[in-house]
């Protein structure tokens, strides 16, 4: 307790208290994370933390981030960062993606947009959760990837206007198709629609495989009915339809969803 309070004092946070054998703390986890990030120079990152930070930086940060910026933020040498990047590239290959050094300064995650979205979806599902109150969605953090990934940029995915629109679209499509799904499937579809709404203007999906099959499904008609905006391409409508068709497999935990992504990726490689 004394050691914890020592570090809390450095961060100018309230101390832990023990009363009748119960530890109490008057602050919140979000406040602690905010304070730690303000004093990030005091922290030494583990290898796993560094790799998660790098992936999320290049997925979510909107402004260009140079290799030097990452090295300074993480407080590591160029050699250490190079080894981290090698491991990250190996991980990204499971999503058929790459970390490209196009101008010798900034790294970019490259690959098919559908695979980029699968990685985004996988990260959002692990790091955020949803609950419902008075027919509204409440978004909370799980901190699965730790406290130092770019939370602010990730939180932008949950802008209230976009969140409300995604929720309305999902409920409308489910009602149109008279479809009941599990809570896990609802979360997957809701988060995918958020990814779609955040990315389609700059990273549009125009064509996908099995277009004829997908366009003749009832799910497609429901998607098309509620995504009437002309800016949505046929590829976007059909990709969302594909997720709805797969929603019956989203009945387990996130690891099951992750396996589904990996299996589909493996099949695409054949």
Model segments located where?
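A cross-family "folded-core" feature that marks the main globular domain of proteins
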Residues: 1-270
């Amino acid at each position: 307790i004394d050691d914890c309070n020592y570090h809390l004092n450095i961060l100018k946070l309230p101390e832990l208290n023990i009363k009748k054998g119960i530890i109490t703390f008057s602050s919140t986890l979000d406040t602690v994370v905010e304070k730690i990030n303000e004093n990030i120079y005091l922290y030494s990152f583990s290898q796993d933390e560094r790799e998660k930070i790098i992936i999320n930086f290049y997925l979510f940060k909107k402004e260009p981030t140079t290799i030097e910026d990452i090295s300074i933020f993480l407080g590591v040498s160029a050699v250490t960062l190079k080894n981290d990047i090698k491991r990250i590239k190996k991980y990204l290959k499971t999503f058929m993606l790459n970390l490209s050094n196009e101008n010798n300064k900034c790294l970019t995650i490259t690959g098919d947009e559908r695979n980029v979205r699968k990685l985004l979806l996988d990260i959002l599902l692990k790091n955020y959760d949803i609950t419902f109150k008075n027919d509204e969605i409440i978004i909370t953090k799980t901190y699965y990837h730790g406290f130092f990934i770019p939370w602010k940029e990730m939180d932008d995915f949950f802008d209230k206007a976009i969140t409300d629109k995604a929720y309305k679209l999902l409920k409308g499509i489910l009602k149109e198709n008279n479809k009941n799904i599990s809570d896990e499937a609802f979360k997957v579809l809701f988060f995918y629609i958020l990814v779609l709404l955040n990315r389609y203007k700059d990273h549009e999906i125009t064509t996908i495989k099995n277009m004829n099959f997908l366009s003749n499904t009832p799910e497609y008609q429901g998607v098309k009915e509620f995504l009437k905006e002309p800016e949505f391409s046929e590829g976007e409508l059909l990709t969302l339809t594909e997720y709805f068709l797969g929603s019956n497999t989203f009945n387990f935990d996130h690891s099951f969803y992750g396996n589904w992504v990996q299996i589909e990726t493996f099949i695409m490689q054949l």
